[in-house]
């Protein structure tokens, strides 16, 4: 554990925070702050339904691709990750979580647009993501292979261990359920769904995600309304702990910054290279459409759902001395607000949040296993290993699974950020093309690869 923690310190303190913020600021400027200027367009695009392919097959719709990415994003990071960030970094961590979401959404636009641009045709849907744009766009197949290995490990193994660990911790706290029994049930459910393929994952995600998100946000809004007089004080607490002199002298600002960005990235995945795998599956007329929709997903995750958790914890007066950490802190906070049923509600909500994340995480791994090899036995073996890691996570300690996830997440994000820095110019050209068509009165812009002759030969699906 000490060795893993030392690697984490190097990656997060000296490399990733600088790269994340640097890329986020750069792309915000280059896109003229697309994440703010085109919010209304994002909402309109989300309603687009699946179209028919040339052979008449049904594709994954914009909403389903959005649901897959939200299924992965909205999970443990929103309930347990936010609580961990506050417990370790203080309330100021929430401010930096907001910052990385607001600025990092531009990176999400770039990577998801590139995922659409360089996608290829799969058996039952389109397939794409960073591994594909590294190979086809950067002409660096070794880099694509490295990324594919990293994301397959990060999402299929490390992140899914975190999800199952948190589900079991919450269930034990609320119901006294044995970890082994619940871990076995989770593993069985996971295997049944993932062996059904992307279409089954898309259908399940598009049902679970809206219901669970609306239910959780609705409860949080009730709590905010009941504590509305305390809202200015909570916001002031968040800001003061992000910049206060007392915190700066104690090293608290740096801890808040690191925890906010680390847990924010785990939750919203902006710039990490995961969402492009979901974005690439959608059947749309222009790559920029999925870029815009995935930008909205970042806001939905962090500014809405993570903020709900933060307010629930800070309104409750739950101790932030480190005596309670992770999902138990969220459960204790909600119990303080609505009584003993709060712990049960968190356990149930977390089951759906985290289980949908397991499905979304698995799909990211599958898309990249298919990049590495088309051998069916490898894919089946990967599915079984994913189930095994779900079981492992249910039995492991909290610190172990979070530390492993932090290392693999950092390596994956660094690899992707390097790629989008070089390829981002193409996403910006696509954004300009989309804006020009909208300005010309075209209601639904259409991209034709002939408009980019310098890379036309690398684009399979346009």
Name each model feature, range by range.
Residues 1-76, 87-92, 391, 422-462:
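N-terminal alpha-helical transmembrane segments of multi-pass membrane transport
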Residues 5, 9-45, 87-124, 300-306, ...:
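Extracellular loop-to-transmembrane helix junctions
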Residues 19-26, 31-43, 165-171, 178-226, ...:
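Membrane-interface loop-to-helix entry segments
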Residues 23-28, 100-124, 130-165, 169-194, ...:
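Helix-loop-helix module between adjacent transmembrane segments
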Residues 30-35, 77-82, 91, 155-168, ...:
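Transmembrane helix-loop junctions in multi-pass membrane proteins
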Residues 33-60, 84-94, 106-138, 319-337, ...:
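Flexible loop linkers connecting adjacent transmembrane helices
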Residues 53-88, 114-117, 123-131, 135, ...:
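Alpha-helical membrane segments and immediately flanking helix-loop junctions
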Residues 110-118, 123, 219-237, 251, ...:
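Extracellular/periplasmic helix-exit of transmembrane alpha-helices
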């Amino acid at each position: 554990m000490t060795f893993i923690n030392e690697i984490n310190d190097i990656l997060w303190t000296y490399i990733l925070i600088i790269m994340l913020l640097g890329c986020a600021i750069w792309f915000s400027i280059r896109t003229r702050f697309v994440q703010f200027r085109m919010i209304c367009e994002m909402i309109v695009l989300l309603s687009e339904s699946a179209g028919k392919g040339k052979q008449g097959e049904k594709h994954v719709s914009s909403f389903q691709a959005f649901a897959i990415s939200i299924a992965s994003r909205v999970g443990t990071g929103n309930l347990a990750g936010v609580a961990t960030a506050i417990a370790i970094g203080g309330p100021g961590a929430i401010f930096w979580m907001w910052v990385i979401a607001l600025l990092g959404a531009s990176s999400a636009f770039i990577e998801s647009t590139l995922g659409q641009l360089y996608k290829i045709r799969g058996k039952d849907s389109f397939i794409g993501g960073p591994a594909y744009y590294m190979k086809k766009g950067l002409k660096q197949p070794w880099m694509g292979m490295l990324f594919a290995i990293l994301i397959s490990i990060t999402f299929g193994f490390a992140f899914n261990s975190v999800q199952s660990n948190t589900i079991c911790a919450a269930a034990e706290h609320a119901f006294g359920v044995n970890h082994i029994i619940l871990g076995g049930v989770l593993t069985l459910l996971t295997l049944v769904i993932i062996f059904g393929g992307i279409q089954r994952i898309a259908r399940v995600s598009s049902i679970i995600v809206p219901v669970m998100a609306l239910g959780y946000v609705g409860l949080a809004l009730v709590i905010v309304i009941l504590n509305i007089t305390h809202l200015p004080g909570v916001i002031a607490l968040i800001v003061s702990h992000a910049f206060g002199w007392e915190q700066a002298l104690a090293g608290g600002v740096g801890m808040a910054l690191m925890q906010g960005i680390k847990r924010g990235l785990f939750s919203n995945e902006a710039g990490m290279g995961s969402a492009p795998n979901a974005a690439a599956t959608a059947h749309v007329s222009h790559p920029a459409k999925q870029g815009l929709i995935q930008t909205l997903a970042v806001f939905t995750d962090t500014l809405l759902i993570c903020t709900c958790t933060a307010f629930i914890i800070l309104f409750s007066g739950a101790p932030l001395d480190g005596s309670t950490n992770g999902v138990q802190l969220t459960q204790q906070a909600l119990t303080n607000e609505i009584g003993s049923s709060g712990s049960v509600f968190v356990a149930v909500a977390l089951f759906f949040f985290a289980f949908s994340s397991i499905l979304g995480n698995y799909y990211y791994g599958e898309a990249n296993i298919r990049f590495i090899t088309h051998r069916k036995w490898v894919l089946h073996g990967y599915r079984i290993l994913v189930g095994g890691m779900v079981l492992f996570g249910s039995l492991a300690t909290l610190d172990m699974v979070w530390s492993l996830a932090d290392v693999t997440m950092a390596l994956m994000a660094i690899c992707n950020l390097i790629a989008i820095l070089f390829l981002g110019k193409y996403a910006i050209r696509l954004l300009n093309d989309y804006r020009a068509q909208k300005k010309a009165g075209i209601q639904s812009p259409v991209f034709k690869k002939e408009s980019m002759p310098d890379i036309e030969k690398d684009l399979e699906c346009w």
